[in-house]
Amino acid sequence: MSVVGLDVGSQSCYIAVARAGGIETIANEFSDRCTPSVISFGSKNRTIGVAAKNQQITHANNTVSSFKRFHGRAFNDPFIQKEKENLSYDLVPMKNGGVGIKVMYMDEEHFFSVEQITAMLLTKLKETAENNLKKPVTDCVISVPSFFTDAERRSVLDAAQIVGLNCLRLMNDMTAVALNYGIYKQDLPNAEEKPRVVVFVDMGHSSFQVSACAFNKGKLKVLGTAFDPFLGGKNFDEKLVEHFCAEFKTKYKLDAKSKIRALLRLHQECEKLKKLMSSNSTDLPLNIECFMNDKDVSGKMNRSQFEELCAELLQKIEVPLHSLMAQTQLKAEDVSAIEIVGGATRIPAVKERIAKFFGKDVSTTLNADEAVARGCALQCAILSPAFKVREFSVTDAVPFPISLVWNHDSEETEGVHEVFSRNHAAPFSKVLTFLRRGPFELEAFYSDPQGVPYPEAKIGRFVVQNVSAQKDGEKSRVKVKVRVNTHGIFTISTASMVEKVPTEEEDGSSLEADMECPNQRPTESSDVDKNIQQDNSEAGTQPQVQTDGQQTSQSPPSPELTSEESKTPDADKANEKKVDQPPEAKKPKIKVVNVELPVEANLVWQLGRDLLNMYIETEGKMIMQDKLEKERNDAKNAVEECVYEFRDKLCGPYEKFICEQEHEKFLRLLTETEDWLYEEGEDQAKQAYIDKLEELMKMGTPVKVRFQEAEERPKVLEELGQRLQHYAKIAADFRGKDEKYNHIDESEMKKVEKSVNEVMEWMNNVMNAQAKRSLDQDPVVRTHEIRAKVKELNNVCEPVVTQPKPKIESPKLERTPNGPNIDKKEDLEGKNNLGAEAPHQNGECHPNEKGSVNMDLD
């Protein structure tokens, strides 16, 4: 079973996997751990990752990047309309109102949703992980920004489902970083001690996130989070781009914004310049050749100028930090450490601002680029049964307060209740109780729309169906279980109605059966309490909310004893006495039955099942097309490689191994094949290249074999000659009565001599025949035949010549005057045997126990 953590960023992605030795960040086919979040579409296939980024400038209109923030948003979203102006590709509205991306693929115009584009990127990451692990990848944990709303999170889950990934958890970036930090720490305070508070700061390509976490041994709790979704390294790049656009317009009369390719080149160079200024404070040049209209441009900037240019952005850094400290009510002295991650935190001015705010130096003990992916892989290992990981519980926080609104049964007014406050523990479940006579609706929304970086405050509408009044006309008691799950998504998981069913007592046996019902059928309230205890154990608390109209309570309600449980012991004794008496009349008896109710969810920007299936089918077809195109290109490259290899060697090492007539014919075929490759064969089917390769190999293979045989034959013949000399010398020593071989039987040695003579005769004949042939003729014997003779010779001779000499027993000593005969050898052997038995007498056997793979986390 695979354990994979995926950090899917706006600019780049990282993949971490769990192995027996710990967590490892893996590299792609370019030996790079960083895979760009770029997808390029061509006339035959898709290109994803490094190869796509390399052609981003030349295929700007069909290369998609920076699409992560489009998840779960409508096309008319203000953020989408603003970002649309800065993109090299076109955005279009989809049929469901979402964001679509228009590209030319397979020479046709296609419209892909954001979920499909992300699924393509996940396909590449999945393929990279499978190539590294050498096994299929299904289970994974994917990172998302902590400020992602329900709609955005569901959109990411749909993308994972399209590519066939089972996302065990959508993990917040900062929570993943905290897990990667805390699980390796050996000096954390005990559970009963004051926790260690650490602040994590992450500035990536497009966003800025901070969180405060409390650590104890074996657990972490997120105290609070804050963020600026529109502040990242990209904004610093844009400041440089704006500066140099204005400079080039004045200096060279060139408008870089008028041509998308020129603007993309300037973006790339400004990003490089920003990274250089992080380590150099001197003036640094920026040079671009043939920028526009065949003109070269140049400029320069130093760190102080850059910081002055970005002063407005640097001031924004403190806003989320102030927000975090206010939410958590922490002081600077309460914070033990400040850990920074993310590529943009390498900017010296960013580090200085963070350090100045807290009044202490920042720490860089974590890998700034890979910390999120490693944390996701650790979480996946914790959730996977295939790995045994140190016990470590993770309690996340709800980033935005969530409320429910509903209509009263008999009034026009609405009831509102905040079920999850800001920074409430998650995952978490609560139960709300309603008194209703019919189906009713609940609408979930974010209580503070101004604090949510998303235009729609509504989460979804939930309809609790099949609710009916009791048979006596009273309102039914409906219990609704609301939950923020492991993905950070709000949902109404279950709803149940407490139904009172009257029964009649007919005889003593029926009464006795009814009296046993409490043991066989627990009441609904006790069942709910059990569920809540199980669900809330993840967060460590067990609150229960009972809501009736506008009345709310944070304490568990006392169950209404309307069934058999309301009987007192005295009443039970009275009933027992009445069993022996004839029944006076049939008495009604109330049973309490739990009825599960269906809940219909209408969520914001949720992909339908049919649309999702269509996307899955489309992705499968594109994967197959990419595979076929790769095989076709590999076949074409094999033909081209074959042409160059034989042409080069026919004028070199292969020249002696082909006759002049065949040489000219082969060279002519190579030239014709090369011309065909760059003309008619530029775009042919895979089979056409296979046929061409077979035609070339038909002429080239015999030449190649002659060369290889000529190279290897002398070495193999020399080995055979050495073995013959070795066995011939042993036979001669035997005939000379050498003591080393006098134990060998005469008949056995004759077999050796016969085999040596036969093989020697065969070798001489072969060498004489081969000497008469020229190099351009096929050899008389192949090297594999000579190796077979060596093996045959060894099989006959080696068992004979390596026979051990028989052991000679030492004579027994005569009786000595002081005692009986003593066989010293036997006595010695006895002592040795006695000593050898001692370990067996005292030793113990402990069989190895097979278990889960242990991960080395120390």
UniProtKB/Swiss-Prot annotation:
Compartment(s): Cytoplasm; Nucleus
Up-regulation conditions: By heat shock.
GO cellular component term of the entry, any: nucleoplasm
GO MF annotation: an example: alpha-tubulin binding
Post-translational modification: Phosphorylation on Ser-509 may be important for regulation of the HSPA8/HSC70 chaperone activity.
Function summary: Acts as a nucleotide-exchange factor (NEF) for chaperone proteins HSPA1A and HSPA1B, promoting the release of ADP from HSPA1A/B thereby triggering client/substrate protein release. Prevents the aggregation of denatured proteins in cells under severe stress, on which the ATP levels decrease markedly. Inhibits HSPA8/HSC70 ATPase and chaperone activities.
Protein name per Swiss-Prot or TrEMBL: Heat shock protein 105 kDa
Recorded name of the encoding gene: Hsph1
